[in-house]
Regions:
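ABC-family P-loop ATPase nucleotide-binding domain
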Residues: 1-15, 226-238
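H-loop (His-switch) and adjacent beta-strand-loop-beta switch element
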Residues: 216-229
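ABC family nucleotide-binding domain
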Residues: 4-219
Length: 238
């Protein structure tokens, strides 16, 4: 585990304005995640964990409080700077894969590099490298709608890594997968964390999926009610 914080949140508060008035979603949240950690975030529906992940991903902003990502105070950045920081530091993995159905895997994986203006030949090389890393060597020309769900999620992980991201935010990444495939995907996350030092923050409602992480953060009613290491029993999968 690294000692350098990649995520630091202090006194984070988030509320949404509705016709009935302000609705607080996150209340006085404090959290530091260091480089190389593997953290599971859990909580019941409506606990604030999804809003928290959106803020971590620079897809939403807090009402008040501080969020420092990779040494940058996100509250001091404009929208363009925030987008640039997000694209440089974070790789996203979602439950629904979010691959372009009419594009092959190589082009899907290279997409974040296209947004950054990387030359097509360079992007293609990096995409093939990442596909090989996630166990999809030789699949670059395969169409995303012609492969299995597990292979699609592997491709999505390759896309999250292609920017040399230091941090992966994974939102229910096994939600659409069967038990065996879920285990394969979580073993891949474990390998990326152990061998490459990738920081992983994972939202899940499944205890067996959370048990692959080394640290558990639990939300209830917009507050962190538990933050600690997994027990030895829970670590059995890792």
């Amino acid at each position: 585990m690294g000692s350098e914080p990649v995520i630091r949140v202090e006194q984070l508060f988030k509320q949404y304005e509705t016709a009935a008035g302000a609705v607080p979603v996150l209340k006085d949240v404090n959290l530091t995640i260091n480089l190389g950690e593997f953290v599971a975030v859990m909580g019941p529906s409506g606990s604030g964990k999804s809003t928290f992940m959106n803020i971590l991903g620079c897809l939403d902003t807090p009402t008040s409080g501080t969020y420092v990502l990779n040494g940058e105070d996100t509250g001091t950045l404009n929208a363009d700077q925030l987008a640039q920081l997000r694209n440089e530091v974070i790789g996203f993995v979602f439950q629904g894969f979010n691959l372009l159905p009419r594009a092959n895997l190589e082009n899907n994986v290279a997409l974040p590099l296209v947004y950054r203006g990387v030359k097509k030949t360079v992007g293609a090389t990096q995409a093939r490298e990442m596909l090989e890393k996630v166990g999809l060597k030789g699949y670059g020309n395969s169409m995303s709608n012609q492969i299995s769900g597990g292979q699609q999620q592997r491709a999505a992980i390759a896309r999250a890594l292609v920017n040399r991201s230091r941090l992966i935010l994974a939102d229910e990444p096994t939600g659409n997968l069967d038990t065996t495939t879920s285990r394969e995907i979580m073993n891949l996350f474990t390998r990326l964390n152990k061998e490459d030092g990738i920081t992983i923050v994972l939202v899940t409602h499944e205890h067996d999926i959370a048990s692959y992480a080394k640290r558990l953060v639990r939300f209830v009613d917009g507050r962190i009610v538990h933050d600690g290491a997994m027990t030895h029993t829970e670590e059995a999968h890792a």
